[in-house]
């Protein structure tokens, strides 16, 4: 067993090698303070034949890591929680670009949290543990990567803040990369205000992150290189294509290839290339269909990149900074509290907004928080197969859908003034040709306004792309699906005119230089300005239907009266909710009653509750201590019997009082009883 200690900045990381999980290709135990993560890499020795990278990353939290038993009916960890899925994606998106293009060995990276101190950053720790384990596995010539988080407190940037400091921050910036460049970014603004970060400040934060990553990666490579396994996979030359077939495609079928490139819809484009491949296969039997399809893909990609780099023209004839045409419609769904249909080119998002009560908030349990937390602002993103012309079933929420919804949520969260409101936005992607998550942000911002939610400002989103060839590169605004597939970068940026509220950057290269990222940030600001102008024009035309929006009425009663509103087994409150068609939240310690629904019904509900409590008080006032009554047994319970009293109301005859007189009662019996006390609005009885 070997121990390696890395001191970088304000962190001391410890790595125990060959201690546990020794049958894995490589494994280690990572420690940062009281946080322990078991990281392992397992590789199959037989490559797959399909043309994709068979990489799976799983980040797993164990409740015992924080000294907890899982909540819910089943007391064991079940399906992955949102935080686990999002962290798995974070690690996957960092590591995937580092693999050689022709790597085909099934590889699984597992991160298991065994112990956790909530002051430590689990995502940074997990990514660093994964990076170290992958570097030690030496399954391919993969560079060392690391991660850091940047916060901003009192206008000062802080590297790898504690959880306490992050709670005070106006910025949450997660960056990962190699010694040379950055290859993954996640950012969101934090706080009660919008806290959009200006582009020059964002560059400053990224420079600070890159400096930290450069130092950490250098330390990792120096420390871990002596312990690497023997290299499993040497990077080859890739697939060698037939030059004669390539020439044939360029000379005889080039016009048809261009037609396919210019087809805007994914399904239409795929059909064009299938027809071309079939046509060539029939005319030239010496080439296999697979060979033809690979060559077609090569010619298509080369031509798209040439058009963009040299001609400065995109496949759909747009200029590099041109945003697709935008249209916005509102109030399409009369029963929802808001609905916005945002269309940008062939990407269309229908965002529906619904307001709720405290008990509508989503409750989460994870290791990052001591107690369950309530998610009051929810953004759910759905990507049905028909939006890209596919005929397949709609299943469970995918990792991608969860990630896109989380990005849109982060973009809009700080724009909401009242953070106590419970809001659910749902984005239904009805048509997709790139940038659907950013269309969701635009529609979502307008849906908040249309729901009557007070916002600091509208927020717009745009996806930026890049095509790079040697020393030349071109930045693209509002990328289409084809440009995303054939380009080198997907950089989603959301914000207002002043700055950025959220962003997410992924790359297919080993990394992106800072000057390129800054160019993309400035170009995105120009695109955002154009989109926000259209959104503000649409906002002026939105008619908020306040009569349809739910109204909230809050009032207080004596805390001991809350149980009366609930009633035996919840009977009273159920009847009230069904009768008036409202939602009710009750706070027993404070006596607060919150009613939400149609304004007229809310007021009638409040009146009913107050009158009901008053009538109970009046019933109590009719009786005196030691008064003897003739009562009727209403219902029998485990702890006694509830009796219907002659002047109205009911009282409780406890079981012990019945037992001492050896009385056996049944419902409907009449019995003489005596009032012995009043307690919290209840009448206690004894046998007379």
UniProtKB/Swiss-Prot annotation:
Sequence ranges assigned to domain KH in this UniProt record: 550-609
GO biological process: mRNA catabolic process; RNA processing
Primary location class: cytoplasm
Domain of life assignment: Bacteria
A GO term for molecular function: 3'-5'-RNA exonuclease activity
UniProt KW Membrane keyword: no
Record Pfam families: KH_1 (PF00013), RNase_PH (PF01138), RNase_PH_C (PF03725), S1 (PF00575)
Keywords: Cytoplasm, Magnesium, Metal-binding, Nucleotidyltransferase, RNA-binding, Transferase
Chain residues that bind Mg(2+): 484, 490
Enzyme Commission number(s) of this protein: 2.7.7.8
Cellular component, GO, one term: cytosol
Record keyword Transcription present: no
Cofactor(s) the protein requires to work: Mg(2+)
InterPro entries per the UniProt record, alphabetical: ExoRNase_PH_dom1, ExoRNase_PH_dom2, ExoRNase_PH_dom2_sf, KH_dom, KH_dom_type_1, KH_dom_type_1_sf, NA-bd_OB-fold, PNPase
Catalytic activity: RNA(n+1) + phosphate = RNA(n) + a ribonucleoside 5'-diphosphate
Residues covered by the S1 motif domain: 626-688
Subcellular location: Cytoplasm
Family: Belongs to the polyribonucleotide nucleotidyltransferase family.
Protein task: Involved in mRNA degradation. Catalyzes the phosphorolysis of single-stranded polyribonucleotides processively in the 3'- to 5'-direction.
Name the record gives this protein: Polyribonucleotide nucleotidyltransferase
């Amino acid at each position: 067993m070997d121990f390696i200690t890395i001191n970088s900045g304000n962190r001391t990381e410890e790595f125990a090698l060959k201690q546990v999980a020794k049958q894995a290709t490589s494994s280690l135990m990572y420690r940062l303070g009281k946080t322990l993560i078991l990281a392992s890499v397992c590789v199959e020795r037989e490559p797959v034949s399909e043309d994709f990278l068979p990489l799976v990353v799983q980040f797993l939290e164990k409740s015992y890591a924080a000294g907890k038993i899982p909540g819910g009916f089943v007391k064991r960890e079940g399906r992955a929680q949102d935080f686990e899925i999002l962290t798995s994606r974070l690690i996957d998106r960092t590591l995937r670009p580092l693999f050689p293009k022709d790597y085909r060995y099934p590889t699984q990276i597992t991160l298991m949290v065994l112990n956790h101190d909530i002051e430590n950053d689990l995502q940074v720790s997990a990514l660093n543990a994964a990076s170290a384990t992958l570097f030690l596995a030496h399954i391919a010539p993969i560079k060392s990567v690391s991660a850091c988080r940047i916060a901003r407190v009192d206008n000062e940037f802080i590297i790898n803040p504690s959880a306490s400091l992050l709670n005070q921050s106006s910025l949450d910036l997660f960056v990962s990369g190699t010694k040379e460049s950055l290859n993954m970014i996640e950012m969101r603004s934090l706080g009660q205000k919008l806290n959009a970060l200006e582009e020059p400040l964002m560059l400053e934060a990224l420079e600070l992150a890159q400096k930290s990553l450069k130092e950490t990666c250098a330390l990792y490579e120096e420390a871990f290189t002596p312990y690497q396994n023997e290299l499993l996979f040497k990077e080859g030359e890739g697939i060698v294509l037939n030059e004669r077939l390539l020439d044939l495609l360029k000379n005889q079928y080039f016009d048809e290839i261009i037609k396919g490139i210019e087809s805007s819809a994914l399904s239409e484009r795929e059909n064009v290339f299938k027809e071309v491949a079939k046509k060539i296969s029939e005319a030239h039997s010496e080439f296999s269909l697979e060979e033809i399809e690979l060559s077609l893909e090569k010619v298509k990609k080369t031509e798209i990149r040439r058009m963009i780099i040299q001609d400065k023209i995109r496949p759909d004839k747009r200029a590099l900074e041109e945003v697709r045409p935008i249209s916005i419609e509102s109030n399409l769904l009369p029963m929802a509290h808001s609905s916005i249909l945002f269309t940008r080119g062939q990407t269309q998002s229908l965002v529906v907004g619904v307001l709720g009560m405290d008990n509508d908030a989503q409750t989460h349990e994870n290791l990052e928080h001591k107690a369950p937390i309530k998610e009051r602002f929810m953004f759910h993103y759905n990507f049905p197969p028909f939006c890209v012309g596919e005929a397949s079933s709609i299943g469970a929420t995918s990792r991608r859908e969860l990630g896109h919804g989380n990005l849109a949520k982060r973009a809009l969260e700080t724009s909401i003034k009242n953070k106590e409101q419970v809001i659910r936005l749902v984005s239904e992607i009805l048509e997709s040709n790139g940038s659907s998550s950013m269309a969701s942000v635009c529609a979502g911002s307008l849906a908040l306004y249309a729901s009557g939610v007070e916002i600091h400002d509208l927020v717009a989103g745009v996806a930026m792309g890049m095509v790079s060839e040697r020393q030349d590169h071109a930045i693209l605004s509002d990328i289409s699906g084809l440009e995303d597939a054939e380009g080198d970068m997907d950089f989603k940026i959301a914000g207002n005119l002043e700055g950025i509220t959220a962003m997410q950057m992924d790359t297919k290269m080993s990394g992106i230089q800072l000057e390129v990222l800054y160019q993309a940030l400035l170009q995105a600001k120009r695109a955002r300005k154009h989109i926000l102008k259209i959104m503000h024009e649409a906002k002026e035309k939105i008619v908020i239907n306040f009569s349809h929006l739910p109204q909230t009425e809050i009032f207080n009663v004596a805390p001991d009266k809350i149980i009366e509103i609930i009633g035996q087994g919840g009977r009273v409150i159920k009847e009230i909710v069904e009768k008036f068609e409202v939602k009710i939240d009750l706070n027993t310690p404070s006596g607060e009653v919150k009613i939400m629904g149609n304004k007229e019904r809310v007021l009638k509900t409040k009146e009913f509750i107050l009158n009901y409590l008053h009538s109970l008080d009046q019933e109590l006032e009719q009786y005196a201590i030691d008064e003897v009554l003739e009562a009727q047994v209403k219902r029998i319970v485990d702890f006694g019997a509830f009796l219907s009293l002659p002047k109205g109301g009911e009282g409780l005859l406890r079981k012990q009082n019945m037992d001492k007189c050896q009385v056996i009662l049944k419902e409907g019996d009449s019995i003489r009883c005596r009032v012995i006390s009043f307690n919290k609005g209840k009448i206690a009885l004894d046998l007379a």
